[in-house]
């Protein structure tokens, strides 16, 4: 602990108007000042603190300077590294975090089903500009419509769902707006068949749809085509003939029409 020497007869009288002012001799114009220079921590050893007289101006009281020196001396006795290195940070982390092995688990499909499904409304016409209409409760047909009959054209609700991870195409399901009917692919006899299937609107559409409802949408310039996810290389198709049912076919670019124009509608 630093100590302030006791006053003796050899010490001169000083006066000051303010604690923050310099100390001057009471009887002379020499204006001899007394202040303490901050110690160099690198030079401090076991010998204690060395007080020095300096001619530099400090706007601090003598009591404040002595308190600062005592505090600096206590800090100088603390053990510390000159540079903060990576090992120091690693040691801190080891005290806070505990390393444990990470295991991966496959999530149940229920969580995927709860995900929000993004959808849009659209109309589809084949390359011959035939529109799709609902000919009976569960049959879609493609035919040319006159202007006064365009209200018969089916509006699809296209929902974006989960597909195979290894497939880069866009998986979608196609439902009829406000009818709870969805296009699906089923095997009838020995041939995949396209049909309309009614679903509970409280449960569908959902992110993880059954594979028979899923189609992979591919865009080719300004046209789109829809391939069955359950039956690869089978596509939603229309006939070149008028007023025939929409079906599932394999003849791309042949007699059957597999490419469509899509008109996106506002919600």
UniProtKB/Swiss-Prot annotation:
SUPFAM superfamilies reported in the protein's UniProt record: Cytokine
Superkingdom of this protein's organism: Eukaryota
Keywords, ordered alphabetically: Cytokine, Cytoplasm, Inflammatory response, Lysosome, Mitogen, Pyrogen, Secreted
Compartments, record wording: Cytoplasm, Cytosol; Secreted; Lysosome; Secreted, Extracellular exosome
GO terms under cellular component: cytosol; extracellular space; lysosome
Main location: cytoplasm
Gene Ontology biological process terms from the UniProt entry: cellular response to lipopolysaccharide; cytokine-mediated signaling pathway; fever generation; immune response; positive regulation of cell division; positive regulation of immature T cell proliferation in thymus; positive regulation of T-helper 1 cell cytokine production; positive regulation of type II interferon production
CDD domains referenced in this protein's UniProt entry, alphabetically: beta-trefoil_IL1B
Molecular function via GO: cytokine activity; integrin binding; interleukin-1 receptor binding
Propeptide residue intervals: 1-114
Annotated positions for site Important for interaction with integrin: 169, 177, 179, 188, 202
Gene3D superfamilies referenced in this protein's UniProt entry, alphabetically: 2.80.10.50
Protein family membership: Belongs to the IL-1 family.
Additional note from the record: IL1B production occurs in 2 steps, each being controlled by different stimuli. First, inflammatory signals, such as LPS, stimulate the synthesis and promote the accumulation of cytosolic stores of pro-IL1B (priming). Then additional signals are required for inflammasome assembly, leading to CASP1 activation, pro-IL1B processing and eventually secretion of the active cytokine. IL1B processing and secretion are temporarily associated.
Subunit relationships: Monomer. In its precursor form, weakly interacts with full-length MEFV; the mature cytokine does not interact at all. Interacts with integrins ITGAV:ITGBV and ITGA5:ITGB1; integrin-binding is required for IL1B signaling. Interacts with cargo receptor TMED10; the interaction is direct and is required for the secretion of IL1B mature form. Interacts with HSP90AB1; the interaction facilitates cargo translocation into the ERGIC. Interacts with HSP90B1; the interaction facilitates cargo translocation into the ERGIC.
Annotated function: Potent pro-inflammatory cytokine. Initially discovered as the major endogenous pyrogen, induces prostaglandin synthesis, neutrophil influx and activation, T-cell activation and cytokine production, B-cell activation and antibody production, and fibroblast proliferation and collagen production. Promotes Th17 differentiation of T-cells. Synergizes with IL12/interleukin-12 to induce IFNG synthesis from T-helper 1 (Th1) cells. Plays a role in angiogenesis by inducing VEGF production synergistically with TNF and IL6.
The protein, known as: Interleukin-1 beta
Upper classification of the organism: Eukaryota, Metazoa, Chordata, Craniata, Vertebrata
């Amino acid at each position: 602990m630093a100590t302030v020497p006791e006053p003796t007869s050899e010490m001169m009288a000083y006066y000051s108007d303010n604690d923050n002012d310099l100390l001057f001799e009471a009887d002379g114009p020499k204006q001899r000042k007394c202040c303490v220079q901050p110690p160099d921590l690198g030079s401090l050893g076991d010998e204690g603190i060395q007080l020095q007289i300096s001619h530099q101006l400090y706007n601090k009281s003598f009591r404040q300077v002595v308190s600062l020196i005592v505090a600096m001396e206590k800090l100088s006795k603390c053990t510390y590294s000159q540079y903060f290195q990576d090992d120091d940070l690693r040691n801190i982390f080891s005290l806070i975090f505990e390393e444990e092995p990470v295991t991966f688990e496959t999530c149940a499909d229920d969580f995927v089903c709860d995900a929000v499904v993004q959808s849009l409304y659209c109309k589809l016409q084949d390359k011959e500009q035939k529109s799709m209409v609902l000919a009976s409760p569960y049959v879609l047909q493609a035919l040319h419509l006159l202007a006064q009959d365009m209200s018969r054209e089916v509006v699809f609700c296209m929902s974006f769902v989960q597909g195979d991870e290894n497939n880069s195409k866009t998986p979608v399901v196609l439902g009829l707006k406000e009818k709870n009917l969805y296009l699906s692919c089923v095997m009838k006899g020995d041939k995949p068949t396209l049909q309309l299937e009614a679903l509970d609107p409280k449960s569908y559409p959902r992110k993880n749809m059954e594979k028979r409802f899923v189609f992979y949408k591919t865009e080719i310039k300004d046209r789109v085509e829809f391939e069955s996810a359950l039956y690869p290389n089978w596509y939603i198709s229309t006939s070149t003939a008028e007023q025939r049912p929409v079906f599932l076919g394999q003849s791309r670019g042949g007699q059957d029409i597999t490419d469509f124009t899509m008109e996106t509608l506002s919600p």
